[in-house]
């Protein structure tokens, strides 16, 4: 099994929170302490909570549920896109459009337009148009692809949301809560875990750490689809000394 250990999370800098002056007191139960004015996240809490998430998404996937991956900040975009595609789930990696969930009927019309333009391009119809018209339609297609390409085949509202950085993606979280769609969220020390059904306390700015969370969720979804046993997160609570690295320096530059 491709387990995730405490050491792997530490090496990825998953334990580095934000500067202490930016903290959200509601995250206090997940904070181990501080170093150089940066909060240290207690990974002994992160590991079992990540395990709870993988078990949950595996059960959802086994029942053919749709889980929408959301991560539009630079540290998350590539991982969200790569792993969502790998496990066959919809995703938003560019910019969350207001009403993407709460006004899905309108969004669906844009998705129909996206499919229409893609079909026209595949059939070579753009080549038969005057240059200006073809250019306008190409730009429209690119814009729709960037905004809606990841949810093109979602086919309706998702059964759950998986969000990297619940503060940055607060509009997505609010829309999901309004529609009573469960939210799984990576929550750093500067954000609130309130209204997040499944919390993953962890660094949401480290690309390596984010990739671990997203990979674990995608692997669990694939396991669920294949009806395999979930065991992605190691329960081995080996002692590993917390050391400073580039992630701490990155956080301190806020």
Curated annotation (Swiss-Prot):
PANTHER family, A to Z: 30S RIBOSOMAL PROTEIN S2 PROKARYOTIC AND ORGANELLAR, SMALL RIBOSOMAL SUBUNIT PROTEIN US2M
PROSITE patterns: RIBOSOMAL_S2_1 (PS00962), RIBOSOMAL_S2_2 (PS00963)
InterPro entries (UniProt xref): Ribosomal_uS2, Ribosomal_uS2_bac/mit/plastid, Ribosomal_uS2_CS, Ribosomal_uS2_flav_dom_sf
GO cellular component terms, A-Z: cytosolic small ribosomal subunit
Provenance organism: Legionella pneumophila subsp. pneumophila (strain Philadelphia 1 / ATCC 33152 / DSM 7513)
Recorded family membership: Belongs to the universal ribosomal protein uS2 family.
GO BP annotation list: translation
Pfam families: Ribosomal_S2
Keywords per UniProt: Ribonucleoprotein, Ribosomal protein
Name used for this protein in its record: Small ribosomal subunit protein uS2
GO molecular function per UniProt: structural constituent of ribosome
Membrane-spanning intervals of the chain: none
Keyword Cytoplasm applies: no
């Amino acid at each position: 099994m491709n387990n995730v250990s405490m050491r792997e999370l530490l090496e990825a800098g998953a334990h580095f929170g934000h500067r202490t002056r930016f903290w959200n007191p509601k995250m206090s139960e997940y904070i181990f302490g501080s170093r150089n004015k940066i909060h240290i996240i207690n990974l002994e809490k992160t590991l079992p909570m990540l395990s709870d998430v993988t078990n949950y998404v595996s059960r959802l996937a086994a029942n053919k549920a749709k889980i929408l991956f959301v991560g539009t900040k630079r540290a998350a975009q590539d991982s969200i896109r790569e792993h969502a595609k790998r496990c066959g789930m919809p995703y938003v990696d560019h910019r969350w459009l207001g009403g993407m969930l709460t006004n899905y009927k309108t969004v669906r019309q844009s998705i129909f337009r996206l499919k229409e333009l893609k079909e026209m391009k595949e059939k070579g119809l753009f080549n038969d148009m005057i240059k200006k018209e073809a250019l306008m339609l190409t730009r429209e297609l690119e814009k729709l692809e960037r905004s809606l390409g990841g949810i093109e085949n979602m086919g309706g509202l998702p059964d759950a949301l998986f969000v990297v950085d619940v503060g940055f993606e607060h509009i997505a979280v609010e829309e999901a809560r309004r529609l009573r769609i469960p939210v799984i969220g990576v929550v750093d020390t500067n954000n609130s875990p309130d209204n997040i059904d499944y919390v993953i306390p962890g660094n949401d700015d480290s690309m390596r750490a984010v990739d671990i969370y997203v990979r674990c969720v995608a692997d669990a979804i694939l396991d669920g689809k294949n009806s395999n046993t979930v065991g992605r997160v190691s329960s081995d609570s080996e002692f590993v000394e917390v050391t400073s690295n580039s992630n701490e320096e990155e956080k301190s530059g806020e």
